[in-house]
From Swiss-Prot:
Basic residues bias: start-end ranges: 34-45
Region entry Disordered, spans: 34-53
PROSITE patterns, per the entry: RIBOSOMAL_L35
Keywords: Ribonucleoprotein, Ribosomal protein
Source organism per UniProt: Borrelia hermsii (strain HS1 / DAH)
Identification of the protein by name: Large ribosomal subunit protein bL35
Length: 65
């Protein structure tokens, strides 16, 4: 049987913590920032954690992570 392939787009977007949770960088912080409040920009700057149901799906996309 051939090796499982890593989904390259998922590899760029997600990272695993030491506890096995999946973290990601939030979107909407690249441009058109003037209309976004400073509170919103500050919250977007922090990384987010993926829910447990989505974590299972991401682990199938990243078999060797």
């Amino acid at each position: 049987m051939s090796k499982m392939k890593t989904c390259k787009s998922a590899r760029k977007r997600y990272a695993f913590t030491s506890k096995g949770k999946v973290k990601y960088k939030k979107q909407n912080l690249r441009h058109i920032l003037t209309k976004k409040s400073s509170k919103r920009r500050r919250k977007l700057g922090k990384s987010g954690l993926v829910s447990s149901s989505e974590t299972k799906r991401i682990k199938t996309l990243l078999p060797y992570a």
